[in-house]
Swiss-Prot record:
Role noted for this protein: May be involved in transcriptional regulation.
Record's keyword annotation contains Ligase: no
Keywords: DNA-binding, Metal-binding, Nucleus, Repeat, Transcription, Transcription regulation, Zinc, Zinc-finger
Ranges annotated as C2H2-type zinc finger: 250-272, 269-291, 324-346, 352-374, 380-402, 408-430, 436-458, 464-486, 492-514, 520-542, 548-570, 576-598, 604-626, 632-654, 660-682, 688-710, 716-738, 744-766, 772-794
Protein name: Zinc finger protein 227
Record-stated family: Belongs to the krueppel C2H2-type zinc-finger protein family.
GO biological process, one term: regulation of transcription by RNA polymerase II
Main location: nucleus
Organism the protein comes from: Homo sapiens
Gene3D superfamilies given in the database record: 6.10.140.140, Classic Zinc Finger (3.30.160.60)
Length: 799
C-alpha cells in the first residue's frame, strides 16, 4: 500500500497533543493476578472495583478509552451471575448485530482519507454510542473478526458471516503523518486483521494495548511528515529504531522472558518481587486502600483504626450491640460471621474435615488448630521457659503463670484463676452444678474432660502408654506423673524441709505434717483428715461400701490399693527384691518396710510407752492400746476390735468358717497364724531360740513367756490376793479359785470348767479321741502332757 501524508489543521493537532499527554487507563489501573484477587475479601473486592470504575469513568469523561477494562469486568462477573439467553433467542439477534457492526466497520475502515487518529476517534465514538444506546443489539462477549484470507466479518462462533467484497483495510497498515508505519505484531497477514469486541465491546487486546499503533499514540506528541517504510518494520523519527516483528532481544535475567524493546524490561522484575509501581502518588494512595493494613476508620473510644469491614464489628464491642439474632435460640451476635458459624451448632454442619483422622469441624480456626496435632507444630515459644504452643492465645495465657497474674477472681472464696474457662468450672464447686452425666452409672461431673476420663473406667480403655515400662493410663496427666518414676524428677519442693515430690497433691498433703491441719472431719466418728479423698475413703468403713471387685475371684474391696495388692495373689508377681536376703515383694512399700528388719530402723516411736515400730500401720494400731479405741464393731455380738483384721477373724467364730486347712492331718483353723503354728508341729520347726538355755519354740509369744522363767518376771498380778504370774493364762486359771466360777459346762455330763481348753480336753473322754501319738511306739494319748510323760520311757529320762 503506498504511503500517504495527511495534513491536519492546527487546532486538531493541539487537541491531539493534549489528548496524548493525558494519563492512560494503564497508568492508573491497579492490576492484580487471579491468585491475588482470591486473597481479597468481599469488602476489599468491592473497594477495588469502585476504584477501578471511578478511574475508568474519569477517562471516559475526558473522551479517552471508552471501553471497560477486563479487570473490572472480571470483578463484576465474580459478584453477579449474568442472565443467560437461550440458544434460540441468541440466534435470532445475530443478524441485527452483524448489520450494526458492518455499518460502522465499512464506514471507517474503508475510508483512506482519514488519519489513524481520526479513524481511532470515529470508531471509538460509534462504539460508545452503541454502548449507551438501546437500539444496538450488541451484547457482552460478541466480537468482530476480519478473516485473514477472505475479509469476512464474523461473530465469535463463526456460525454467521458477512463477506466484504475485495475490501482493503488501510487502517491496519497506515502510514501516519509522523512517518511511522504501524502493523499488528502477531496476526497481520497480507490482507486483514482480527478485531474482538469483548467484555462490553472492548477492542482486541493485541490492538488496544500491545500494538505499536497504541504505543505510538501514547508517546508521540506531535504529528510529523510521513516517510516511506518497508512492510513489517517500525521506523521512528529519530535514532530509536525498533526491530522486526517477533524479535525480542531483551531477556529477563530471572526467568529468561524476552522483550522487543528495552523500556518494558525495567518494569518486568516487579512480577518476581511482587512490587507494584505507579506513575502518580495519588494512584499509589488509592491502591493502598486495597490492603488490609489500611485503617480508614478511627474508634472514638479506644483510638484504634480499622478498615471499613472491621469497624462495625469493633464498635459493637463498645456498644454491646448484637444486631444478628439466631432464629432457633435467640442468641445475639455482633457480626454476621459469628451468626453463620453459630447456625452450624443447630444444623450439625461441619464442613472442615481432617484428611489425617477424618475428624470434622464447624469452624476453620478449630480445623487449623487441630491440624497442628498431626504436624506437632508449635510456632509460639515462651521466652521464659521455652515451652511451645500451637496458638498465640495459649502462649498469652501461659505467660500469666510466670507473671503470677490471675485476673479471674471468685467472689465466694477469693480464689484466682489465669483462665476464664477454669474460673467458670470452679464456680460449679459453689453451685453444685454437675451438667455432665455418665450414661452407664449416672455419675455427674462439673466439666466434660473428667467425664471422658471416667468413661474409660467402664470401657477399660487406657490410651496413654508409658514408653519405658508399657503401663497404660486413662489420662495424659497420669502418664506424665508416672514418667517421673523413671526419671526420678521431683519438681515440687517443700519450703519447710526441702523434701521433693513428683506430684503437687503429694506436696500439699506433706505440708499438713508441718501445719498439723486436718480440715476434713468425719461426721460419724469425728476423725480428721488432711485430704478430702482420704475422708471419702474412710467413710466406707462406716457405710461398708466396697466398690472395687476382683475379676478373678469376685472379692470386693473398699480401696483400689487393696484390690491391686490382692490381685498380686493371683498373678504371683513380686517384682521388688531385697538385696540383703533376696526376698521378693509385690509392692515397693512392703520392700521398704522389710529393709528396716535388716537395718533395725524403727522410726515410729510411741510417746506413751516409748515403744518403737518399723511400720506406720503397726504404730497406729499400737496407739489404740493406750486410747482404748476399738472402731471395728461386730454386728452380731457388738464386740469391738482395734483392727479390721481382728474383726474379720472374730466373725468366723459366728460363721464357723475355718478357711485354713492342714494338708497333713486335714485340721481346719480360723486364723492363718494358728495354721502356721500348727504346721510347725508336723515339721518340728522351732525358729525362736532362747539365748539363755537354747530351747526352741514354734511361736515368738511362747519364747517371750519362757524368757520370764530366766528373768523371774511375773507381770500378771491377782487383785484379790496379790499373787503374781508370768503368763496371763495362769492368772485366769487362778482367778477361778476366788470366784469358783466355771463358765464352761460339758453337755454330756454337766461338769463345769473354768477354761475352755480344759473343757475341750474333758470332751475327749466322751468322744474317745486321742490326737497325740508317740512316734516310736504309735501309742495314742488324749492329752499332750500324757504324751510328754510317756516319751521319757523311750529316752530313759527319769520320770
Amino acid at each position: 500500500m503506498p504511503s500517504q501524508n495527511y495534513d491536519l489543521p492546527q487546532k486538531k493537532q493541539e487537541k491531539m497533543t493534549k489528548f496524548q499527554e493525558a494519563v492512560t487507563f494503564k497508568d492508573v489501573a491497579v492490576v492484580f493476578s487471579r491468585e491475588e484477587l482470591r486473597l481479597l475479601d468481599l469488602t476489599q473486592r468491592k473497594l477495588y472495583r469502585d476504584v477501578m470504575v471511578e478511574n475508568f469513568k474519569n477517562l471516559v469523561a475526558v473522551g479517552h478509552l471508552p471501553f471497560q477494562p477486563d479487570m473490572v469486568s472480571q470483578l463484576e462477573a465474580e459478584e453477579k451471575l449474568w442472565m443467560m439467553e437461550t440458544e434460540t433467542q441468541r440466534s435470532s439477534k445475530h443478524q441485527n448485530k452483524m448489520e450494526t457492526l458492518q455499518k460502522f466497520a465499512l464506514k471507517y475502515l474503508s475510508n483512506q482519507e482519514l488519519s489513524c487518529w481520526q479513524i481511532w476517534k470515529q470508531v471509538a465514538s460509534e462504539l460508545t454510542r452503541c454502548l449507551q444506546g438501546k437500539s444496538s443489539q450488541l451484547l457482552q462477549g460478541d466480537s468482530i473478526q476480519v478473516s485473514e484470507n477472505e475479509n469476512n466479518i464474523m461473530n465469535p462462533k463463526g456460525d454467521s458471516s458477512i463477506y466484504i467484497e475485495n475490501q482493503e483495510f488501510p487502517f491496519w497498515r497506515t502510514q501516519h503523518s509522523c512517518g511511522n508505519t504501524y502493523l499488528s505484531e502477531s496476526q497481520i497477514q497480507s490482507r486483514g486483521k482480527q478485531i474482538d469486541v469483548k467484555n462490553n465491546l472492548q477492542i482486541h487486546e493485541d490492538f488496544m494495548k500491545k500494538s505499536p499503533f497504541h504505543e505510538h499514540i501514547k508517546t508521540d506528541t506531535e504529528p510529523k511528515p510521513c516517510k516511506g517504510n518497508e512492510y513489517g518494520k517500525i521506523i521512528s523519527d529519530g535514532s530509536n529504531q525498533k526491530l522486526p516483528l517477533g524479535e525480542k532481544p531483551h531477556p529477563c535475567g530471572e526467568c529468561g522472558r524476552g522483550f522487543s524493546y528495552s523500556p518494558r524490561l525495567p518494569l518486568h522484575p516487579n512480577v518476581h518481587t511482587g512490587e507494584k509501581c505507579f506513575s502518580q502518588s495519588s494512584h499509589l494512595r488509592t491502591h493502598q486502600r486495597i490492603h488490609p493494613g489500611e485503617k480508614l476508620n478511627r474508634c472514638h473510644e479506644s483510638g484504634d483504626c480499622f478498615n471499613k469491614s472491621s469497624f462495625h464489628s469493633y464498635q459493637s464491642n463498645h456498644t454491646g450491640e448484637k444486631s444478628y439474632r439466631c432464629d432457633s435460640c435467640g442468641k445475639g451476635f455482633s457480626s454476621s460471621t459469628g451468626l453463620i458459624i453459630h447456625y452450624r451448632t443447630h444444623t450439625g454442619e461441619k464442613p472442615y474435615k481432617c484428611e489425617e483422622c477424618g475428624k470434622c469441624f464447624s469452624q476453620s480456626s478449630n480445623f487449623q488448630c487441630h491440624q497442628r496435632v498431626h504436624t506437632e507444630e508449635k510456632p509460639y515459644k515462651c521466652e521464659e521457659c521455652g515451652k511451645g504452643f500451637g496458638w498465640s492465645v495459649n502462649l498469652r495465657v501461659h505467660q500469666r503463670v510466670h507473671r503470677g497474674e490471675k485476673p479471674y477472681k471468685c467472689e465466694e472464696c477469693g480464689k484466682g484463676f489465669t483462665q476464664a474457662a477454669h474460673f467458670h468450672i470452679h464456680q460449679r464447686v459453689h453451685t453444685g452444678e454437675k451438667p455432665y452425666k455418665c450414661d452407664v452409672c449416672g455419675k455427674g461431673f462439673s466439666h466434660n474432660s473428667p467425664l471422658i476420663c471416667h468413661r474409660r473406667v467402664h470401657t477399660g480403655e487406657k490410651p496413654y502408654k508409658c514408653e519405658a515400662c508399657g503401663k497404660g493410663f486413662t489420662r495424659n496427666t497420669d502418664l506424665h506423673i508416672h514418667f517421673r518414676v523413671h526419671t526420678g524428677e521431683k519438681p515440687y519442693k517443700c519450703k519447710e524441709c526441702g523434701k521433693g515430690f513428683s506430684q503437687a497433691s503429694n506436696l500439699q498433703v506433706h505440708q499438713n505434717v508441718h501445719t498439723g491441719e486436718k480440715r476434713f472431719k468425719c461426721e460419724t466418728c469425728g476423725k480428721g483428715f488432711s485430704q478430702s479423698s482420704k475422708l471419702q475413703t474412710h467413710q466406707r468403713v462406716h457405710t461398708g461400701e466396697k466398690p472395687y471387685r476382683c475379676d478373678v475371684c469376685g472379692k470386693d474391696f473398699s480401696y483400689s490399693s487393696n484390690l491391686k495388692l490382692h490381685q498380686v495373689i493371683h498373678t504371683g508377681e513380686k517384682p521388688y527384691k531385697c538385696e540383703e536376703c533376696g526376698k521378693g515383694f509385690s509392692w515397693r512399700s512392703n520392700l521398704h518396710a522389710h529393709q528396716r528388719v535388716h537395718s533395725g530402723e524403727k522410726p515410729y516411736k510411741c510417746e506413751q510407752c516409748d515403744k518403737s515400730f518399723s511400720q506406720a500401720i503397726d504404730f497406729r494400731v499400737h496407739q489404740r492400746v493406750h486410747t482404748g479405741e476399738k472402731p471395728y464393731k461386730c454386728g452380731v455380738c457388738g464386740k469391738g476390735f482395734s483392727q479390721s483384721s481382728g474383726l474379720q477373724s472374730h466373725q468366723r467364730v459366728h460363721t464357723g468358717e475355718k478357711p485354713y486347712k492342714c494338708d497333713v492331718c486335714g485340721k481346719g483353723f480360723r486364723y492363718s497364724s494358728q495354721f502356721i503354728y500348727h504346721q510347725r508341729g508336723h515339721t518340728g520347726e522351732k525358729p525362736y531360740k532362747c539365748e539363755e538355755c537354747g530351747k526352741g519354740f514354734g511361736r515368738s509369744l511362747n519364747l517371750r513367756h519362757h524368757q520370764r522363767v530366766h528373768t523371774g518376771e511375773k507381770p500378771h498380778i491377782c487383785e484379790e490376793c496379790g499373787k503374781a504370774f508370768s503368763l496371763p493364762s495362769n492368772l485366769r486359771v487362778h482367778l477361778g479359785v476366788h470366784t469358783r466360777e466355771k463358765l464352761f459346762k460339758c453337755e454330756e455330763c454337766g461338769k463345769g470348767f473354768s477354761q475352755s481348753a480344759r473343757l475341750e480336753a474333758h470332751q475327749r473322754v466322751h468322744t474317745g479321741e486321742k490326737p497325740y501319738k508317740c512316734d516310736i511306739c504309735d501309742k495314742d494319748f488324749r492329752h499332750r502332757s500324757r504324751l510328754t510323760y510317756h516319751q521319757k520311757v523311750h529316752t530313759g529320762k527319769k520320770l
